């Protein structure tokens, strides 16, 4: 056995096999649901697909308006959500990095919690690093959503006078498709960040035991599925004209 293979086996022994299985279930649940939701939205009206339809209708209405101040205010209000979450995520990441600096004391504190699994400081650090990685991903998605809303504001700012559309020099439908798609992409990025927040709650279960980690992952995926495809607000939006 060469040195590389030996090191690989040594890395695998850092975590017990139940923890490795729980990690695999976590990533399959997260990535798998993201792929499933995207493909399902193409054939079935999900919450995101339905709101994208309304975004396109909104952009189509802007082509008829002479004064578009209200539209600019709406875009600004929409961009405040990813901005708030991005700022909050930075604070969370900072707190988690601070925990890494006192991992031994934190690991001892976690051991005193009822039903919490007794682990070494190294394993505790790995759990904190995973949680930190989840929030780092969320931060990137929130900031990208914020930038995309900025791009959407630019598209609206470059919108010609409504008389240009009336004369047939530009197509209302093409503009609505383009601008609505930009707004939809911003919403999708924001949705990815929120999904990461949900998955972070599943990671918290890992501090108790691998079983709670798996149960938390399954529970979060179920909640995400119900809200995206079977929520009350989706039924209302789909029933609206």
Segments (PLM) and residue ranges:
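Solvent-exposed, non-transmembrane helices and loops of integral membrane proteins
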Residues: 61-69, 154-185
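Membrane-interface amphipathic/juxtamembrane segments adjacent to transmembrane helices
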Residues: 37-75
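Alpha-helical transmembrane segments and their immediate juxtamembrane interface regions
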Residues: 103-144, 205-241
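Short, strongly hydrophobic alpha-helical membrane anchors
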Residues: 1-15
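Transmembrane alpha-helical segments and their cytosolic interface motifs
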Residues: 71-97, 124, 128, 185-214, ...
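Hydrophobic alpha-helical membrane-embedded segments
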Residues: 19-46, 83-97, 128-151, 198
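Membrane-spanning helices that line or support transport/gating and their immediate boundary helices
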Residues: 35, 39-44, 151, 155, ...
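Cytoplasmic juxtamembrane regions at transmembrane-helix boundaries
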Residues: 97-112, 148-166
């Amino acid at each position: 056995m060469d040195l590389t293979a030996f090191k690989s086996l040594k890395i695998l022994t850092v975590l017990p096999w139940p923890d490795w299985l729980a990690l695999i279930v976590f990533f399959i649940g997260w990535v798998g649901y993201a792929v499933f939701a995207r493909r399902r939205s193409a054939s079935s009206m999900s919450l995101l697909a339905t709101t994208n339809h309304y975004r396109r209708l909104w952009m189509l209405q802007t082509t008829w308006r002479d004064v578009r101040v209200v539209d600019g205010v709406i875009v600004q209000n929409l961009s405040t959500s990813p901005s708030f979450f991005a700022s909050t995520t930075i604070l969370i990441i900072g707190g988690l990095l601070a925990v890494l600096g006192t991992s031994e004391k934190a690991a001892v504190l976690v051991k005193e919690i009822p039903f919490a699994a007794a682990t070494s400081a190294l394993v505790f650090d790995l759990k904190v690093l995973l949680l930190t990685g989840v929030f780092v991903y969320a931060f990137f998605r929130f900031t990208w959503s914020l930038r995309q809303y900025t791009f959407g504001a630019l598209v609206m700012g470059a919108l010609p006078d409504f008389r240009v559309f009336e004369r047939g020099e530009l197509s209302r439908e093409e503009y609505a498709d383009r601008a609505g798609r930009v707004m939809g992409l911003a919403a999708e990025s924001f949705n990815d960040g929120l999904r990461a927040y949900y998955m972070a709650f599943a990671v918290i279960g890992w501090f108790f035991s691998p079983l709670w980690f798996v149960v938390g992952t399954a529970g979060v995926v179920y909640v995400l599925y119900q809200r995206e495809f079977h929520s009350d607000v989706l039924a209302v939006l789909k029933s609206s004209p």
